[in-house]
Amino acid sequence: MKAIISLLLISAMVFSMIEAVPVEEGLQLFEGERGCLPHNRFCNALSGPRCCSGLRCKELSIWDSRCLG
C-alpha cells in the first residue's frame, strides 16, 4: 500500500514539473526540432507539410524546398 501511494505522489510531482514548461517555449522547441528555417524562408523537407511561419512547404526539387503562401 505504501508503494502505491509513493508511486502516485511521484507521478503527481513529475506531472507538475512537466506542466511548468510554458506552452510557447514548448512550441519553439518543437519548431526547432522540425528543422524550420524561418529567417531565409526555406523549410526542411523532413519538417512536415508546414513551415514555422504557417506557410506551406513546397518541394521545388528533391533537394530544394521553400516556404510558400
From Swiss-Prot:
Record's keyword terms, sorted: Amidation, Disulfide bond, Knottin, Neurotoxin, Secreted, Signal, Toxin
Top-level taxonomic group: Eukaryota
Main location: secreted
A GO term from the CC aspect: extracellular region
Residues annotated as signal peptide: 1-20
One annotated GO molecular function: toxin activity
Disulphide bridges, residue numbers: C36-C52, C43-C57, C51-C67
Localization: Secreted
Propeptide: 21-34
Domain notes: The presence of a 'disulfide through disulfide knot' structurally defines this protein as a knottin.
Function: Insect active toxin causing rapid but reversible paralysis in crickets. No activity shown in mammals. Does not show effect on mammalian voltage-gated calcium channels.
Family: Belongs to the neurotoxin 01 (U2-agtx) family.
The protein, known as: U2-agatoxin-Ao1g
Species in which this protein is naturally found: Agelena orientalis (Funnel-web spider)
